[in-house]
Structure formats: C-alpha cells, structure tokens
C-alpha cells in the first residue's frame, strides 16, 4: 500500500466537537516515519492507510463468509485483523526447557510438550468463573461452590480479617499482628505464596496478606453485619440459580439476548464506565534505574492489572453468558493489548511520557536501561500521539477497549452446539459495542462522512496496538528466558499460554506427517478431553 500518496484529507484529523460529551505478531513491519523515532518527544500526526476503507463499506465477500446475505452491521470484523495467538490450553509452570534444549522437528517437539506439561488453567478459570451460580447438582457446601483463600488459593474456611482465607493463613495473620512480625525474606521479597509454598517465607506471606486486603479491624463487631448481608446474598443467589434451572434450555439464551438488545447505546456506555478498573499503585524503582529494577516494577504492575482486567471483563454486559472456554480464550488473546490501551489512555495528555501508574511515570529515555524496550516505548508513544491527534474521548476509549477484548479471537476451536451458540452470542455482543461506539461518534455533531472517517481512523489504529503488544510479549518472554526478572502467578500463566500457542502455530505452518496432522485436528476439536 502506498502510504505517501494518500489524499491530503487524511493528513489532518477532522474537527471534533467534544462539548456535547455527557460523561465525565507476530514479526512484521510497521510504517513509522523517521520523525517518530528520533530523540524528540512530541510526534506529529502520521497517515496510516489509503482512503479505500474510509467509507467503512463492507466487501461483498464478507456477507458470504458470514453465512449468506443479511442485515449489514457496523462490526469492524473486516477492518480489524484477527490475531494469531489462540491458546487452547494453559500451563501453570515455567517452560524453561523450551529455551534450554536444542531445536528439533517442530511437530515432534510440540507433541512431547503436550505430553509432559500439566494442562492447568485453574488460576484464570477460577477468577473468570468466580461469581457464577452453583451447579444444581452440587450442594452449597461442595468444593465446586467454595470460596478460595485470597493469600494462598487454598479452599477458604470463611471470611477472616476482611477477606476470604483458609484456616492456616487466618491463624498466621493473627499470630503476626499479635506478636512479633519482623520477618526477613531470605530472597528478593518476591516469593510465590501458594498452597504448597505458603510456609516457605513468612515475610512474603505477611506481605501478601496485606496486599490482598487483610486488616486488623476484622473483628466480631463487623462479623454480625457481614453475616446478615452474606445470608441475604446467598438466599438471593439460590433463588436466582433455582429460577435459571427451572427455565427451559431454549428460553434462557433468548431472554438474555433480549436484555442485551434492551440496552440502549447510552446505557451500554454507562455500564462500561462503571466497569472501569481502579488505578493500580506501584512503587517507582529507586534511581538509578537498572534493567532488573524496572522490569520488576513493570511485571508486578502487569500482574496486579491482570486481576482487575478479569473483573472488568466480567462486568461487560453479556460476557459472562459466553462459554467459560470462550471467556478464557478471549482474555488470553488480548490481555497485553488491553493493558497497553489503558497505558495509552493514561498517557494521552502527557506528550513524551508513559503513565504506567500514577506513581510510575517514565520518559522515553528512561527505557534505555532495559535492552530492547526502547523500540516498544517508541511504538507506544507514536500510537498515543495519533490518538491525541484524533482527540480520543473517554467514551470512545471505553468502547474501543471492550472491542479489543471481544474481537481478539474470532475463530473457535470446537464445533459443539454450546460453543457455536457462544460464538453467536459473542458476535452479537461485539455488534452491540460497535453500535455504541457509532452512537458516541454521532453524538459529537460532526457530519455523516466525518463520522465514518473517524470510526475508520480509530479502528485502524488498533492494528498498531496489536503490533506493539506482540513486541511487548516477545520482549517479556526474552527477559524471562534470560532470568532478568522472575514471573509468577497469573502473568506467568498468560505467558505460558502464549508460548504454547507459538509452538502450535509453528506446527500449523510446517510440514507434518498426515498421521500427526489428523491427531492435531482431533485434539483441537476436543480441547476438554486433553
């Protein structure tokens, strides 16, 4: 595509009236002019695409792909490239031997990987399905219905000191606040605290108790009021679940779709606003910056933001109605893009700076201490500058971020009836969010032609967000491989999913024997049996 010969109308953004606002991959080339990667911090506007897509017209072949002619929607499925990272399963420990052993035949290496690594996506599944109703088959006291300890992820015995916790962590916190708690970590104050290793480091265990919200004032006086609320909430949930169990299987999905259709674009935007995650604070590394200290701060921040991101996704109307497999797959596919989109929004009013957190603001030049991260900083600053040129509004940002999540993985791996129904719900939800974005742009008062141009400009920038996220993922994996920074918990699980996805992508692109090819197809069609 000839970028330099694009019409002049694309070089300057359309005038945008924000006075009517009512609400406060893989490896590829990217076109960034030289003025975007020099030492200056303020970047001019850059033209990305030819005007062929500016009219927002959907090609005729898209209608055929979607199963015949029908009502044309404003969904950006044809403007927005679909990702390649699609993870059918998640591993729960580090894959260090992937980097230590010599390269072998692609399909042989991946086959041995699947047989030797434990298939475990418990962390992500537990967080995604945390507020689902109990199964009618299981009783209220079964483990399937139980809460988990916020400190070590063991089964919780109750609500102690302000959080759900097990008896062991409850007793440990009680001893710590009543006696001496001058514990010292023998390592780097980053020990993993889980069910099996919670006794290995008292200092890190106490630190995590405070991080998850344990407080000294979780006393008997609070317990009575909490029990009343908990008893009422439990009764409401049981009634709600019983009502859902009595409905016929064909009526419930239709009712949920009608509820989503009943939401006006304005109400959907208000819901997205209420779902926004809180700001995460992280201590700024002490000067002078080192590669280890900066990467430690960034990975700790990412791990905390991932927890809030899962809660945010579950508050999007209709997301929890998707199958658990689709929810996990979407989050695995887009988490880095969502984090980077939030970073760009926080940095949009601060040219030349990246606002990772309110207390972690970095200049471009401060990234020189980390090998390879300066290129990612330049890409983030360039794309943020383009959003600034377009005068991105908060309501537009809310819709765009939700679209990143919902459009992150469009090709299902299975063809079961329930999964086909989930894919249909996903497309319906994506169309609803897209219509909300169209409504937000229309409320600005600009002409119809300018509305189409603005919508296309916003959606086309998302491919650059995707490219930056791929570079960021590659860099983080490289840092983990070199043991520059340890990676734990949910961030580790997401990274391992990315590694396994990369192995499967190499299998698809290479020549395999027919027997192995048929086995891989059977495995992809039955992911739950693996």
Curated annotation (Swiss-Prot):
Q: What is the effect of changing residue 105 to D?
A: Abolishes repression by activated ErbB2/ErbB3
Question: ATP-binding: present as a keyword of the record?
Answer: no
DNA-binding region residues: the ranges are: 149-214
**Which Pfam families does the record cross-reference, listed alphabetically?**
ERbeta_N, Hormone_recep, zf-C4
Q: What is the effect of changing residue 87 to A?
A: Enhances repression by activated ErbB2/ErbB3
Q: Where are the zinc fingers (NR C4-type)?
A: 149-169, 185-209
Q: Which UniProt keywords apply?
A: Activator, Disease variant, DNA-binding, Lipid-binding, Metal-binding, Nucleus, Phosphoprotein, Receptor, Steroid-binding, Transcription, Transcription regulation, Zinc, Zinc-finger
Tell whether Ribosomal protein is among the UniProt keywords: no
Q: Which cysteines are joined by disulfide bonds?
A: none
Disease in which the protein is involved: Ovarian dysgenesis 8: An autosomal dominant form of ovarian dysgenesis, a disorder characterized by lack of spontaneous pubertal development, primary amenorrhea, uterine hypoplasia, and hypergonadotropic hypogonadism as a result of streak gonads.
**Quaternary form?**
Binds DNA as a homodimer. Can form a heterodimer with ESR1. Interacts with NCOA1, NCOA3, NCOA5 and NCOA6 coactivators, leading to a strong increase of transcription of target genes. Interacts with UBE1C. Interacts with AKAP13. Interacts with DNTTIP2. Interacts with isoform 4 of TXNRD1. Interacts with CCDC62 in the presence of estradiol/E2; this interaction seems to enhance the transcription of target genes, including cyclin-D1/CCND1 AP-1 promoter. Interacts with DNAAF4. Interacts with PRMT2. Interacts with CCAR2 (via N-terminus) in a ligand-independent manner.
Name of protein: Estrogen receptor beta
**Which organism is this protein's natural source?**
Homo sapiens (Human)
Q: Which classification does the entry list for the species?
A: Eukaryota, Metazoa, Chordata, Craniata, Vertebrata
């Amino acid at each position: 595509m000839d970028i330099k010969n694009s019409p002049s109308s694309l070089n300057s953004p359309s005038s945008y009236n924000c006075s009517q606002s009512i609400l406060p991959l893989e490896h590829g080339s990217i076109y960034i002019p030289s003025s975007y990667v020099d030492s200056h911090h303020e970047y001019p506007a850059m033209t990305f695409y030819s005007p062929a897509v500016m009219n927002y017209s959907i090609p005729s072949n898209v209608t055929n792909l979607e199963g015949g002619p029908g009502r044309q929607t404003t969904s950006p499925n044809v403007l927005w490239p679909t990702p390649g990272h699609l993870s059918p399963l998640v591993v729960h420990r580090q894959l260090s031997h992937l980097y230590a052993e010599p390269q072998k035949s692609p399909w042989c290496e991946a086959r041995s990987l699947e047989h030797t690594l434990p298939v475990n996506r418990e962390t992500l599944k537990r967080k995604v399905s945390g507020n689902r109703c109990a199964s009618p088959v299981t009783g209220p006291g079964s483990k399937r219905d139980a809460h988990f300890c916020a400190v070590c992820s063991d089964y919780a015995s109750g609500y102690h000191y302000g959080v759900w916790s097990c008896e062991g962590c409850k007793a440990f916190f009680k001893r710590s606040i009543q006696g001496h708690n001058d514990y010292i970590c023998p390592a780097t104050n980053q020990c993993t605290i889980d069910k099996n290793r919670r006794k290995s480091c008292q200092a890190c265990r106490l630190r995590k108790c405070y991080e998850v919200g344990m407080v000294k004032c979780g006393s008997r006086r609070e317990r009575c009021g909490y029990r009343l609320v908990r008893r009422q909430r439990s009764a409401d949930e049981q009634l709600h679940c019983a009502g859902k169990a009595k409905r016929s299987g064909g009526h419930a999905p239709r009712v949920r779709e009608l509820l989503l259709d009943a939401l006006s674009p304005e109400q959907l935007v208000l819901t997205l606003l209420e779902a926004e995650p809180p700001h995460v604070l992280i201590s700024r590394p002490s000067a002078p910056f080192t590669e280890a200290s900066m990467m430690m701060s960034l990975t700790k921040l990412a791990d905390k933001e991932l927890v809030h991101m899962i809660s945010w996704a579950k508050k999007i109307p209709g997301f929890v109605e998707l199958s658990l497999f689709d929810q996990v797959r979407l989050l695995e596919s887009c988490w880095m893009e969502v984090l980077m989109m939030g970073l760009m929004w926080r940095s949009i009013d601060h040219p030349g700076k990246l606002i990772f957190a309110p207390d972690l603001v970095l200049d471009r030049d401060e990234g020189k201490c980390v090998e390879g991260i300066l290129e990612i900083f330049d890409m983030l600053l360039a794309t943020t500058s383009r959003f600034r040129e377009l005068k991105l509004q908060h309501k537009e940002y809310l819709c765009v971020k939700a679209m990143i999540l919902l459009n992150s993985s469009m090709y299902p791996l299975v063809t079961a009836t329930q999964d086909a129904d989930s894919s249909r719900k996903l497309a319906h939800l994506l169309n609803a969010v897209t219509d909300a974005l169209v409504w937000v742009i229309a409320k600005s008062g600009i002409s119809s032609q300018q509305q189409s141009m603005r919508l296309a400009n916003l959606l086309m920038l998302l491919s650059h967000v995707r490219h930056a996220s791929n570079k960021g993922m590659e860099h983080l994996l490289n840092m983990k491989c070199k043991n520059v920074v340890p990676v734990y918990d949910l961030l580790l699980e997401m990274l391992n999913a990315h590694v396994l996805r990369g192995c499967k992508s190499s299998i698809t692109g290479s020549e395999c024997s027919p027997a192995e090819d048929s086995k891989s197809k059977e495995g992809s069609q039955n992911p739950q049996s693996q």
